[in-house]
C-alpha cells in the first residue's frame, strides 16, 4: 500500500512539473529499499537462532529425563547420583544459555541499528518531502486548478508518509507486512519472542534473589540493634506454620512484624492463628498470615473478619483493662487511658483468644499437607537459587545443594551466623542488643542440644531395631529360603531392612548436619559472649569471663562462661526497661496530665515509680549510668535524682489530694472538740480554720511540687491558683471576725497607749514630742479605717485624712529641727576634741573639719537648706586644704634647694606645659651645677661628667620620658665603670708581675728595694685614681636611681643624700690614709697581724639589736657589740632566690642564673700578691660613725628638716621644748 501511494504520487508530481519534489520522493523510495535490506539482514541473524534454541530444548529434555529417574526406593545413593546428573545438565545448560545470550545480544544489536537507521532515513526523507511540497504549494498556489489537485495529492502523500514513519517504528506491523515474502520469518520471530520472555523472566528471578540478599542483610542490621535477627523470627514463624510458607515469605513477614515491635513468641501465635484459618476456610497460608499480622498491627478488623476471627475493638479493650486492673497496682485503668501500645496488645490478645476459642480444637490435627510443604520447600529452593545466582560467589552445584536440601539444621546455622554477624557489629554501649543476642544464642544452643539428644536416641533405637531384625533374619534364613523355593512367603523383611537402613542413613546424615550446626551455634554463643565482654561493666555485673584451658597456648581466646540464670535475670530487667522506653511517650503524657484529675495523678505516680525502679535495677545489673538511662527515656529528666524528686512530688500530691473526706472529718472533729471545751462558737470556728488552713497549705505545697515538674502545665497552674484562692478565703473569714472585735475596742486601746506614753519618763522633750505626734498619726489612721466601714462615715474619713497630713507635717518639722541640732553639735564636738588633743597643724585641722562636714551633709539629706549650707562649707574647706598643700610643696622645694646649694625656681601654681618646661630648666640647672662641683674634685671626674653629659644627651633623643632617660643613663654609666675597673685590674696585674720579677731577680740591694718601692707607689696611685673614678660614677648612678625611686620632687632629698655620701667617699679615697696599708717593699713581709681580742661588753644604755648575740659568739661580721651585722659564709646561689649581702647594710641580690658567692678569706688561694696575702681595697662610704660626724657638721640642715616635719603635724621644736 505504501509503495503504491508513493508511485502514484511520483507520477502525479512528474506530470505537473515538480522536479525537486519528485527527487525527494525518490529519496524516500531509496530509504525504504535500505530498510528492506536491513530487514533481510535481521532475518538472516534470526535464522541462526533455531539451532541454538533447539540445543537448549534438548538439554532441557535430558535434564527432565534425569529428574524422572529419581526414585526414593533406591535410597540416598540414588538421589545423590540423580543430583549429580542434574548438576552436569545444569552446567551444560548454563553454557548454552551463555552462548544464547551472546548471539541474542549480537542479533539485537544488528536489528536495533538497522531499525534505527531505517527510522532515521524515513523520517529525514519525509521531512524533506514535506518541505518541498510546502514550497511547491506556495509557488503554484495561484496558477490553475491542476495545481490544486497537486496540493491535494501532496497532502495525501504527507499523510501516507506519516503512516509509513509510524509503521517503521512498530516492529510487529513491519514483520507482518513482510510475512508473504519472509518465509520462516514469523516462526523465527515467535521463537525469538518466547526466548526473550524466558530471559526476561530469568533476569527478574535474579532481581528477586538480589532483593532477598538485601532482606537478609536488613535482618542482620536489625539484629544488631534489637538483639534478635529477623532470620530467627522467620524461623520461628516457619516452624509455627509447620513449613507451610517458604523461608522467603517468612523473612518478609518477620521483617514487617519486627518493624511493628512483635517478638518471636507473638509471631508463633500469629502463625498458629493463620494456620487455623487456612485449614478451616481453605485460604492461602501466605495470605492468611499477611492478614493476621497487618490486621493486628493496624487494628483493622476487616482483614481478620475474612479469616473467621470477628472481634469488636471495645470488647478487646475492656477485657484488657480488666486484666490490668486485676494486677492490683493501685491504678484504675479505663479504655480511654490505654496507650497505643496497650491497645495493640489488647487486640493481639483478643485475636489469639478468639482464634483459640473457635478453632483451637484443630491444633492437634493441623499439619501442613504434602503439597503445601512441597510448594514451600520448592519456593524456598527457588528463592535460594535466585539468591545464589544473584551473588555470583559460589559454584552452581554447591548453591543448588545448599538450597534444594535446606533442612532445619541449615536454617539454624544461617540464623546462628546472622546472630554472630550481628554480635560482631553491635556497639559495646548497646546493652539491650548485647544481652538479647547472648540470651538468644544460649537458648538456641540449649534447645538444639536437647533436640539433638532426642535425634541420637532415636537413631540408636533405629540401629537397635535394625540389628534385631537382621539377627532375626539370620536365625530364620533356612526356613525363609525353603518357603521362597516353594513359592510361599516373600521379601517383606528385606524391604523393612532396606527401609530401616535408609531411615538410619538419613538419621545419621541429619546427625552429621546437626554436628555442624552445633558447632556454628556454639560459635554464636562464643561471639555473643565476646561482644558482651566488650562492655566491661556489664560483664562484671554478670560475672562473665573467658575460661582458658590448663594447656592453653598464647593467642587462645578461651571459652565464654556466664551463669545462665544471671543472664536471664538481666535480660528480663533489660526487657522491662526497653518496654518502659517504648511506652515512655505515654508515661510522659500521663505526667503532663497528672494535674487534670486524681486518677491521672495516681497513674502518673505509679508509672514514674515503675520507671525509677526499672532505671535503678537496670543500672545496677548492667553497670550503665543511671543518669544516662534516664536521659534515654526522653521523659524530660536529666538525672535520676531529678526523676526521684519528681516521683516524690507526685506521690505527695496524690497523698495530699486524695483524702478530701478525711480532711473534712478532721476539721469537723477539731471544731466539735474546741466547742465542747470552751462553749465558744467563735473559738471553735477559729480552731477549725487553723486545721483547714494547714490542710490547704499541705495541698498547696504538693501542687507547687507538681507544678515544678511541669512549669508550663495549665492544669497545674489552675490547681495552684485554686488552692491559693481557698486559703485566702479561709483567712478572710478570720479577718471579718477579728475586725469586729477591733472596731469595738479601738477607742479604749488608743487611750491606753496615750496613758502609757505620758507615764514614760526616759525621753527628752524633743523625743516625747515626736513620740506623741507619731501616736496621734497612728490613731488617726486607725480612725480612718474605722470610719471607712461606716455607711455615714465619709465626712469623718476626710477630716481624719486632713488631720493625718497636718500631723505628718509637724513630725517632719520636728525631725528636721532635731537633726539640725544634732548636726550642728558635731562641729562643736570637733572643736572641743581638737583643743583637748592640742591639734595645731593646719592640715590636720582642715582635714578633720572636712570629714565632719561630710557627715553633716549625709545626715542633712532631705533638708534642702541644710544640704546647700554644708555643701558650701565643704567646698571652702577643700579649697583651703588644697592651697595649704601647694604652699608647703613650694616651701619644701625652696628649703631643699637652698640646703644643698642648688639653683631651683619654684613651680608652684604652674600646670601643663608651663610646669614641664620649668621642671626641665630646674633639672638642667641642677645637672650643670653638679657637674661643675664634680670637676672641682678631680680632672678625670670632669671628663667622666662630660662623657656622662654626652651620653645623657644621646639617650634623651630616644627615650620616652625623663625617668626612662635617667635609668638608661645610669645603665650606661655602670657599663663605663665596669670598663674602668677592668682596665685598672690589667694595670695592677702588670705592676704585680714586675714586682714579682724584681723580687725574684734581686730584691735585696738598695737599688732593687727602691725600684720595688717605686712600683708599689705607682700601683697605689693607680688604685687610688681608679677608686676615685669608681666613686664618682657610682655616686652619679646612685643620684639617678634616687631620682627614679620616688616621684619628683620627693626624690630630691634622696638625690642629695646620695651625692653627699659620694663626696665623703671621694674625699677619703683622695688621701693615702684612706687606702689599705701596704707593707714596705724593702722590709720583710708580715705574715699576720694581731688585732686584739673581741670585747665582751655590751652598752645596755643603747637600743638592743639582733647582732649582739652573734658578736659575743664570735660570728663573722662587722661593727661592735651594739652595731654588729653578721655576714654570710658564702655558698651557692640559685635563680629566683634572694640573698642578703653587703658589709655595711643589707643588699638583696636575686640572680637569674646559677651563681656562687666566695667569702673574702678564701680569695687568697686564687689571687695572691708577692707578699703571699690578698690585696684588699677598702672603700669606706657613710657608715654609722661617718653619718654622726656628718650630722654634727650639718646640724642646721637637719634642724630645718625636723622643723618642717613638725610643722606639717601642727607643732614646732620650740613647742616640744616647752612641753
UniProtKB/Swiss-Prot annotation:
GO molecular function terms listed in the Swiss-Prot or TrEMBL record: lyase activity; peptidoglycan muralytic activity
GO terms (BP aspect): defense response to bacterium; killing of cells of another organism; symbiont entry into host; symbiont entry into host cell via disruption of host cell envelope; symbiont entry into host cell via disruption of host cell wall peptidoglycan; symbiont genome ejection through host cell envelope, long flexible tail mechanism; symbiont genome entry into host cell via pore formation in plasma membrane; viral tail assembly
InterPro entries: TMP_PB2_C, TMP_PB2_N
Enzyme class: lyase
UniProt-annotated site: Cleavage, residues: 1127-1128
Gene name linked to the record: D18-19
Keywords recorded for this protein, A-Z: Antimicrobial, Bacteriolytic enzyme, Coiled coil, Degradation of host cell envelope components during virus entry, Degradation of host peptidoglycans during virus entry, Late protein, Lyase, Pore-mediated penetration of viral genome into host cell, Viral genome ejection through host cell envelope, Viral long flexible tail ejection system, Viral penetration into host cytoplasm, Viral release from host cell, Viral tail assembly, Virion, Virus entry into host cell
Domain notes: Probably forms a coiled-coil structure.
Quaternary structure and interacting proteins, as annotated: Homotrimer.
Record EC number: 4.2.2.n1
Superkingdom of origin organism: Viruses
A GO CC term assigned to this protein in UniProt: virus tail
Full protein name: Tape measure protein pb2 precursor
Coiled-coil segments: 441-519, 838-941, 1003-1032
